[in-house]
Amino acid sequence: MAKKRVDKRGTRKPITKIKFLVEGITEKFYFKELLKFKEYSAHLDIDDIGGGGYFAFTREISKNKSLYDIVVIIADLDRAVIHFGEKEKLVELISLLEKLNIKNNIFLTYKNIETWQAATLPYKINDLSLELGYSGKSKGKEDIFQRLMDKGAEFEIGKRKFKLENLYYIKQGLEKGKFKEGNISKTQSNLIYFFEYLRDVLEAKIK
């Protein structure tokens, strides 16, 4: 007599899905491969907004908020310094993220993502595109993560080159973040606690 099949699907722990939103295609290529490398593939859902500034993130989240559980944004901070009105739009974006879900977060780098990528190398460089062997700017290069790895880049190296006290916006836990206005144009990146935050979000018990 055949054994009765037991459906164990109901006992499986659901996988927490995080929606990652980045500015452009280069960031998408880089973080997609980085997250795979760090074994976050099960939680990987990443899209770029095609530029457009902080309001483009706000528009995307507002339009699709019913589809998103947790949203993590990765963006450049120099826009808030250079362009009139962008700082206010950034603050509005952060307020929206916190209002929708305290697990949401934004990771900002000044000047931009290339600043972070260059910092992950074990030596100082002047031109990231040139160092990685690109004939033009490094924008839109599908293999940028691998080229960085081939040069000895490590996420942990980048973490050591930025200071927590230099951050403009700090949100390390599941509570509202804090602003330090005087830091907005300092070289910085809160990617220094990126994976620690993801771990805490995935292990969190709060809804």
Report residues per predicted region.
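Short beta->alpha junction loops
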Residues: L44-G53
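C-terminal accessory helical subdomains adjacent to catalytic cores in phosphodiester-
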Residues: A2-K17, K28, E33-L44, T58-V72, ...
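Short hydrophobic beta-strand that contains or immediately precedes a catalytic carboxylate
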Residues: K19-E23
